[in-house]
UniProtKB/Swiss-Prot annotation:
Entry annotated with the keyword Metal-binding: yes
Cofactor note: Binds 1 zinc ion.
UniProt cross-references to PANTHER family, sorted A to Z: ENDORIBONUCLEASE YBEY, CHLOROPLASTIC
Alphabetized GO MF terms: metalloendopeptidase activity; RNA endonuclease activity; zinc ion binding
Lineage: Bacteria, Pseudomonadati, Pseudomonadota, Gammaproteobacteria, Enterobacterales
Protein name (database record): Endoribonuclease YbeY
Length: 156
């Protein structure tokens, strides 16, 4: 098994109801070993204010979002296991899970899987890329024991 190193940062006022560090590690271990032998990821849990500010600064979107991914780009000659940072807004994740009628734990897992794939270079801007990324997300989520996160969209 490959090494996954997690730096979990709690930067939100309310810690009650958040997944445990072991959950985040398990979700990362469901993704990263498929692509790398060793990876280090920071997961920062934030409130809506920080998510909103980061989303505005880096994406020009004037609202908080569920997950932001910040890949680490080392010079080509430097080999480091640092993959990057995931910033996850717990209020947005909780609200989305409720609105989409998804189990909260499954939605948290999906945000970690989705964000990790962004760190690995996957994107969903073009339709073809989106289909590839969603297919990978579904496969990884099912291996982790969760339902297809896009099932409701596919059935609509």
């Amino acid at each position: 098994m490959s090494d996954v190193i997690l730096d979990l940062q709690l930067a939100c006022d309310e810690a009650r109801g958040l997944p445990a560090e072991a959950d985040f590690l398990r979700w990362l271990q469901g993704v990263l070993p498929l692509f790398r032998d060793c990876a280090e990821v920071t997961v920062r849990l934030v409130d809506e204010a920080e998510s909103h500010e980061l989303n505005m600064t880096y994406r020009g979107k004037d609202r908080p979002t569920n997950v932001l991914s910040f890949p680490f780009e080392a010079p080509p000659e430097v080999e480091l296991p640092l993959l990057g940072d995931l910033v996850i807004c717990h209020q947005v994740v909780e609200r989305e899970a409720q609105q989409q009628e998804k189990a909260l734990e499954a939605h948290w897992a999906h945000m970690v899987v989705h964000g990790s794939l962004h760190l690995l270079g996957y994107d969903h801007i073009q339709d073809e890329e989106a289909l590839e990324m969603e297919s990978l997300e579904t496969e990884i989520m099912q291996k982790l024991g969760y339902p297809d996160p896009y099932l409701a969209e596919k059935e609509a």
